[in-house]
Amino acid sequence: MKKALIAMSGGVDSSVAALLMQQKGYECVGATMKLFENEQAGVKREKTCCSLDDVEDARSVAYRLHMPYYVFNFTANFEKEVMDRFVCAYEKGWTPNPCIDCNRYLKFEKLYLRMQEMQMDTIVTGHYARVVYDEASGRYLLKKGLDNSKDQSYVLYNLTQEQL
């Protein structure tokens, strides 16, 4: 049986993705990446990236789908790979986009490595995008989601061929 690591945000999209993969016969394991200590920053009980509420929502969905669930703590990596880069760029007068670095160096790179460590076959997210294998070029292509109004392919643009 193939195994899928489900990147769970606590939202509807990743929850539905988990259910769909189970229906396709995959053995699924849910995971949420803890990137920021919201509570230490005084942000409490708000729906922000990586909040405790998000973690609990994801854990609840995983429980209902009878799948194991993990929280990967990457807060130190987030500070180094995202916040330090953001501050450095901002001090130079640039207009940094921390989400790009977070997606590239943490959300997808670290999650991909964790997937390999866990001997899983694939990572599944709730992003609206398509990955298509092009026979002519021998490459995977990242394409817009079928519903243009919900397309999130831009979030995934930094993925390598191996990650796609």
Name each model-derived stretch:
Residues 158-164:
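Internal nucleotide-binding/catalytic subdomain
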